[in-house]
Amino acid sequence: MTNPAPSDALVIAGKHYRSRLLTGTGKFKDLDETRLATEAAAAEIVTVAIRRVNIGQDPNAPSLLDVLPPERYTLLPNTAGCYTAEDAVRTCRLARELLDGHNLTKLEVLGDEKTLYPDVVQTLKAAEQLVADGFEVMVYTSDDPILAKRLEDIGCVAVMPLAAPIGSGLGIQNKYNLLEIIENAKVPIIVDAGVGTASDAAIAMELGCDGVLMNTAIAGARDPILMASAMRKAIEAGREAFLAGRIPRKRYASASSPVDGVIG
């Protein structure tokens, strides 16, 4: 589930992770495909929609824990489908009970069914309650830099701005807002929602995001297992490119070969 601290670890709530790709568990055709895609992604943190996925609520139905055991993965229960702070807090408390006191949670409070944009007022309210209740909150939010900082100040352990609407596959729509969030953050910034393909994930990492969470981009692909593998490589490549430092953009050419010793 967690590993000894490598030189470039993703650190969330004091735990070190080698993988910067977080994956969802919804929309797959069955639990076996969920397992195979998660393995291909090399994900260590997997999100679980408590309202939609069985992790023990129904002892007579197949459980996600059968294929993604907590001993191997960090399960990140989320509040998908919640539209009020009260509902989100109630869902988090249920998850903590089902997972034997597990405090790490992903908070999302939606504004409407059409856009699935976060309701920022309800999100702030829920975040304050959950942090006060001892939860380690990773929070889905808009790409508003002021709001992102406010959620960090409340005590959220990671801030997760959207790249585009959930499930849209549009990719990053406002990289300048993301850069502003990243540059001012003291907690991990993880892009959540809107990624469509590997290049989207790579761009997020090149900008300096600490990780990317995705579900539809993998589960909705023609070959989810292959896409999971592609996303893993994109995350790794984007992170390495960020650490390496890209060359500056210039208007005019710059010769790659030296002029010293040119004949003539």
Curated annotation (Swiss-Prot):
Which residues does the annotation say bind 1-deoxy-D-xylulose 5-phosphate? G167, A193, G194, N215, T216
Q: Name one GO cellular component term.
A: cytoplasm
- What superkingdom heads the lineage? Bacteria
What SUPFAM superfamilies is this protein classified in? ThiG-like (SSF110399)
Q: Which GO terms describe its molecular function?
A: thiazole synthase activity
Query: What InterPro entries does the annotation carry?
Result: Aldolase_TIM (IPR013785), Thiazole_synthase_ThiG (IPR033983), ThiG (IPR008867)
Q: What GO biological process terms does the UniProt entry carry, in alphabetical order?
A: thiamine diphosphate biosynthetic process
Keywords, ordered alphabetically: Cytoplasm, Schiff base, Thiamine biosynthesis, Transferase
Extract the Pfam families matched here: ThiG
Q: Which reaction does it catalyse?
A: [ThiS sulfur-carrier protein]-C-terminal-Gly-aminoethanethioate + 2-iminoacetate + 1-deoxy-D-xylulose 5-phosphate = [ThiS sulfur-carrier protein]-C-terminal Gly-Gly + 2-[(2R,5Z)-2-carboxy-4-methylthiazol-5(2H)-ylidene]ethyl phosphate + 2 H2O + H(+)
What does this chain do?
Catalyzes the rearrangement of 1-deoxy-D-xylulose 5-phosphate (DXP) to produce the thiazole phosphate moiety of thiamine. Sulfur is provided by the thiocarboxylate moiety of the carrier protein ThiS. In vitro, sulfur can be provided by H(2)S.
Return the protein name: Thiazole synthase
Origin species: Xanthomonas axonopodis pv. citri (strain 306)
